[in-house]
């Protein structure tokens, strides 16, 4: 007989007890089982003590699957839920308390905290539809839920009642994806009623962002006057012009004029009426029947019309600032030759986007925004083949990332200045060859037409232009002989120019903008040097005062205002085409260098508008 093999290691041995057939006391049949007595001895390995671990990954799923089978076959269930909801037929659902308690804090409290339901086998449930309860019970066992679109609100409401947060989040995410102008208000109201803050916030943001479309829907006309006033009072309402808000309010009143005409005055005070154009106000005062029958509202709008046409500085509500990304756009420019670049800078994260190029390279152009669209006006194409002054007006749509040509100006204008009043673009001065213009023309986007208006009192190229209180200011420049410190102001109602207090410094090619009811003139060229000095014009006192200088001297710079700060971009310092970007904080009277452009350049057109549609950019980049 062969000896039994011994385990490796000195003195090591293992004994296993075989399965024994025993007859437990009181048992009629033989039962095979292993003895609980273990006399085995295992010698540790040479590597020291080790731990054996094993996990069955799908055990939980399998276990809950078996429990669900037991539920469906009504085995081992220890509770019956008797669900009654309004006029719906009552229904009974058998389940296991431990499973319900594991998925719902409400059921857990019901079955474990000494409540009367803890010892009950039949529990009455009210306030939830049986079909909703059926789905929530099924979710407790399967971690899966499915329903038709029309049932989502009911299931979400039930999940909120029983604090099943995962189902609440899933329903909320689904409803966010379904947001539409026709249902956004209803979803927002529902979310508010059930206390789902995240869904309520997302729905409200959708309403603010798509106000123009939402205001055409039935849900909008069913708002209470308090809800409507709250909505149109939002600073972040996304509208192309304030007339959208005005028309929405008038249409809401007309929906039930007999009951709602008493709310017109409250609504008008929530509309940013000082952002409406005098022409628009005049037309409404003449033609709107609701205003005709309300003398107080009519007088209120007449007062605003007078303030606008008299160009009075007024303490009014701030302009709308929708929570959509607003970027600083730079078009064209010059570095050795004219450029066709269109780029956008995001001050919030410091990134640059390369967008659709201008159709023709240009420098010395100007940029402005009307109705969210970016316009590139005039300039010159300096190229190795020759120089061509431009009369072109091109329009860029951020939503499509495409340029489209508009009607050209009456004459080419290089080193032009532009401003916008009442949605109309004013092209000021500039040059065509050796001709230095004092002419000014106005573009009406809705008609795609240019019309000459009164010429300036002085010929100006490299002129800085700004608009404040519906007045157009032309600052500095070059008249063909002298660089200028003079400035003048255009009154659109009178169609005339008037001289104002001259600057402290001669400046041609300065950057001019408006911030906090003051006009700023930054940098420029005085005939000898590029400048870094900055001065500010107070229209109340009619005086220019110096503020902190820029860190770099620069002329032919780009300038704009973004979120209450001035940004200057590029330019020429007398030796180098600059790529630096500086930012001015009026609260601290300090400049800081915030970023660099992708390359140095001067003579760019700059303006601020909405972030472009990334989908369009990605698609067009893929086709290149």
UniProtKB/Swiss-Prot annotation:
Crosslink site: N5-[4-(S-L-cysteinyl)-5-methyl-1H-imidazol-2-yl]-L-ornithine (Cys-Arg) (interchain with R-135 in KEAP1): 151
Subcellular location: Cytoplasm; Nucleus
One Gene Ontology molecular-function label: disordered domain specific binding
Covalent link N5-[4-(S-L-cysteinyl)-5-methyl-1H-imidazol-2-yl]-L-ornithine (Arg-Cys) (interchain with C-151 in KEAP1), residues: 135
Assembly and oligomerization: Component of the BCR(KEAP1) E3 ubiquitin ligase complex, at least composed of 2 molecules of CUL3, 2 molecules of KEAP1, and RBX1. Interacts with NFE2L2/NRF2; the interaction is direct. Forms a ternary complex with NFE2L2/NRF2 and PGAM5. Interacts with (phosphorylated) SQSTM1/p62; the interaction is direct and inactivates the BCR(KEAP1) complex by sequestering it in inclusion bodies, promoting its degradation. Interacts with NFE2L1. Interacts with BPTF and PTMA. Interacts with MAP1LC3B. Interacts indirectly with ENC1. Interacts with SESN1 and SESN2. Interacts with HSP90AA1 and HSP90AB1.
Modified residues (S-cGMP-cysteine): 434
Pathway assigned to this chain's UniProt record: Protein modification; protein ubiquitination
PTM notes: Non-enzymatic covalent modifications of reactive cysteines by electrophile metabolites inactivate the BCR(KEAP1) complex. Accumulation of fumarate promotes the formation of cysteine S-succination (S-(2-succinyl)cysteine), leading to inactivate the BCR(KEAP1) complex and promote NFE2L2/NRF2 nuclear accumulation and activation. Nitric oxide-dependent 8-Nitro-cGMP formation promotes cysteine guanylation (S-cGMP-cysteine), leading to NFE2L2/NRF2 nuclear accumulation and activation.
Domain annotation BACK: ranges: 184-286
Residue ranges of every copy of the BTB domain listed in the record: 77-149
Gene Ontology biological process terms from the UniProt entry: cellular response to interleukin-4; cellular response to oxidative stress; in utero embryonic development; negative regulation of response to oxidative stress; negative regulation of transcription by RNA polymerase II; proteasome-mediated ubiquitin-dependent protein catabolic process; protein ubiquitination; regulation of autophagy
Record comment: activity regulation: Ubiquitin ligase activity of the BCR(KEAP1) complex is inhibited by oxidative stress and electrophile metabolites such as sulforaphane. Electrophile metabolites react with reactive cysteine residues in KEAP1 and trigger non-enzymatic covalent modifications of these cysteine residues, leading to inactivate the ubiquitin ligase activity of the BCR(KEAP1) complex. Selective autophagy also inactivates the BCR(KEAP1) complex via interaction between KEAP1 and SQSTM1/p62, which sequesters the complex in inclusion bodies and promotes its degradation.
PTM-bearing positions, type S-(2,3-dicarboxypropyl)cysteine: 151, 257, 273, 288
Name of the coding gene: KEAP1
Protein name: Kelch-like ECH-associated protein 1
Domain description: The Kelch repeats mediate interaction with NFE2L2/NRF2, BPTF and PGAM5. KEAP1 contains reactive cysteine residues that act as sensors for endogenously produced and exogenously encountered small molecules, which react with sulfhydryl groups and modify the cysteine sensors, leading to impair ability of the BCR(KEAP1) complex to ubiquitinate target proteins.
One CC-aspect GO term: centriolar satellite
């Amino acid at each position: 007989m062969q000896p039994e093999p011994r385990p490796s290691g000195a003195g090591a041995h293992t004994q296993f007890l075989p399965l024994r057939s025993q007859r437990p006391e009181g048992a009629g049949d033989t039962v095979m089982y292993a003895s609980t007595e273990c006399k085995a001895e295992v010698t540790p390995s040479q590597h020291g003590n080790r731990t054996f671990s094993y996990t069955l990954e799908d055990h939980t799923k399998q276990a809950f699957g078996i429990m669900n089978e037991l539920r469906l076959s009504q085995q081992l269930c220890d509770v019956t839920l008797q669900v009654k909801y309004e006029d719906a037929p009552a229904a009974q659902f058998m389940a296991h308390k431990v499973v319900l308690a594991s998925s719902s804090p409400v059921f857990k409290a019901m079955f474990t905290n000494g409540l009367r339901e803890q010892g009950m086998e039949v529990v009455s449930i009210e306030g939830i539809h049986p079909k909703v309860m059926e789905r929530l019970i099924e979710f407790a066992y399967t971690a899966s839920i499915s329903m038709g679109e029309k049932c989502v609100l009911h299931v979400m409401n039930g999940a909120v009642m029983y604090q099943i947060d995962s189902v609440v989040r899933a329903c909320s995410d689904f409803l966010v994806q379904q947001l539409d102008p026709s249902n956004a208000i209803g979803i927002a109201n529902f979310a508010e009623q059930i206390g789902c803050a995240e869904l309520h916030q997302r729905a409200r943001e959708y309403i603010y962002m798509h106000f123009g479309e939402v205001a055409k829907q039935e849900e909008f006309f069913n708002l209470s006057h308090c809800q409507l006033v709250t909505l149109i009072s939002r600073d972040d309402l996304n509208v192309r012009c304030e007339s959208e808000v005005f028309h929405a309010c008038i249409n809401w009143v007309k929906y039930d004029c007999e009951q709602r005409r008493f709310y017109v005055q409250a609504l008008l005070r929530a509309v940013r009426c000082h952002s409406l154009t005098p022409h628009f106000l005049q037309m409404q005062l003449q033609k709107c029947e609701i205003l005709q029958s309300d003398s107080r509202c009519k007088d209120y709008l007449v007062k605003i019309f007078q303030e606008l046409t008299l160009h009075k500085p007024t303490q009014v509500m701030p302009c709308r600032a929708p929570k959509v990304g607003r970027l600083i756009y730079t078009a064209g420019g010059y570095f050795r030759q004219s450029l066709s670049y269109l780029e956008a800078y995001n001050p919030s994260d410091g990134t640059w986007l390369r967008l659709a190029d201008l159709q023709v390279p240009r420098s010395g152009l100007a940029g402005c925004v009307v109705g969210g669209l970016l316009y590139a006006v005039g300039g010159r194409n300096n190229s190795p083949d020759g120089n061509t002054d431009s009369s072109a007006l091109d329009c860029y749509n951020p939503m499509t990332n495409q340029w489209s040509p508009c009607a050209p100006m009456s004459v080419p204008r290089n080193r032009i200045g532009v401003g916008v009043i009442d949605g109309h673009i004013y092209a000021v001065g500039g040059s065509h060859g050796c001709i230095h213009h004092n002419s000014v023309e106005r573009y009406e986007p809705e008609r795609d037409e240019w019309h000459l208006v009164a010429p300036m009192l002085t010929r100006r190229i490299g002129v800085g232009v700004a608009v404040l209180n519906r007045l157009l200011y032309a600052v500095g420049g070059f008249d063909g002989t002298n660089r200028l410190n003079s400035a003048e102001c255009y009154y659109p109602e009178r169609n005339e120019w008037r001289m104002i207090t001259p600057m402290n410094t001669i400046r041609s090619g300065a950057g001019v903008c408006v911030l906090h009811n003051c006009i700023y003139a930054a940098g420029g060229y005085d005939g000898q040097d590029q400048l870094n000095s900055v001065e500010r014009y107070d229209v109340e006192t009619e005086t220019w005062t110096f503020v902190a200088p820029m860190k770099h001297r620069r002329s032919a710079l780009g300038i704009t205002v973004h979120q209450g700060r001035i940004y200057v971009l590029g330019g020429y310092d007398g030796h180098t085409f600059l790529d630096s970007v500086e930012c001015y904080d009026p609260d601290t009277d300090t400049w800081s260098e915030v970023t660099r452009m992708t390359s140095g350049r001067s003579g760019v057109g700059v303006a601020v508008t909405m972030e472009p549609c990334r989908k369009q950019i990605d698609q067009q980049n893929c086709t290149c």
